[in-house]
Amino acid sequence: MLYPAITEAIRHNKRICLATPRADVVQELYPRLKEVFPNTEMEALYGGTGGDRTGVGQLIIATTHQLIRYQNAFDLLIIDELDAFPFHHDPLLHQFAVRSAKKYATKIYLTATPRPKQKRLIESNKLKAIFVPIRFHGYPLPVPRLRLELGLKRKISQNKMLHSLEAFLDSHDPKRQWLLFVPTIQLLTPFAKLLEEKGLDLATVHADDPKRKEKITAYREGKINVLITTTILERGVTFPSIDVVMIDAGHDVFDEAAIVQIAGRAGRSPKDPTGDVLLIHQGKTEAMIQAVKQIKRMNQKGKAL
């Protein structure tokens, strides 16, 4: 979707920055863009990249924190995952972004889940928006299935297997990969133990995991069948053929945007465009209801195209 704009900017010898809040996304985008634009001077900037980065390439792929390096530098500034943490919550990062662009720069903001502020700007015609309700492969977004688990929190506290998760395992193709989202770091190990007892090949991952990159790579290469994760993998990573299960979907950490993003991890491949999304909960929340409505609404708009 961005390639035409980047291609045009490169053709006119303009400087481009594709910024995103998360280092994982920078690491994923850089090789893809390098393959598409092999003759363009390009650099990836994120925390821990070392002192050998000059930051002077024509095309910069960077975390939004790295924009502090620049002032009046870019003719085209693209902010991916506009609503993601930490960019969404930090006014200083917004200032860095504005300062990094030239006065008459073109700015493109990308998000699948605009926040109320962006929605108001769009509705009042203060922010031009193009709505893309369908994926590149033309198939609808997977609609989450909601499953009530009575005594969910009690079972979690007692490290007991959930009936809904057991039913999922019984019906699930054991060769098929899936992601298990839990609301807190503290739940990673208990659920890992429960699933290891079922003989599953798995790993856990969270934001401060020093082996996060290696585990994600192993999962992408099919060496791990199940990845148990916090919301760190709710966005910005692409796995071709997976299903998704969310534990305690009514937890505060799973707001409407998070649920939509997590559901969006499934069905990303044209060879496997459906995917299963299961939300295990102790009671429906407004976030769950609105997320399902939003996904169905997007699918309806996609059908109309």
Short names for language-model regions:
Residues M1-I6:
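Motif I (Walker A/P-loop) of helicase-class P-loop NTPases
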Residues A9, K14-L29, Q158, L162, ...:
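Conserved strand-helix element at the start of the C-terminal RecA-like helicase core
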Residues K14-I16, T20-T64, L202:
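Conserved nucleic-acid-binding Ia/Ib motif block in the N-terminal RecA-like helicase ATPase lobe
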Residues K14-R15, E41, G55-L59, A73-L76, ...:
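Loop/turn-to-beta-strand initiation segments
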Residues E41-V56, L202-T230:
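Conserved helicase ATPase core of P-loop NTP-dependent helicases/translocases
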Residues N72-L150, K160-H163:
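Post-DEXD/H (motif II) to motif III coupling segment of the RecA-like Helicase ATP-binding lobe
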Residues E81-P86, D209, I216, R220-N225, ...:
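Conserved RecA-like helicase motor core of SF1/SF2 enzymes
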Residues A101-K117, A263-Q294:
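Conserved segment of the helicase C-terminal RecA-like domain
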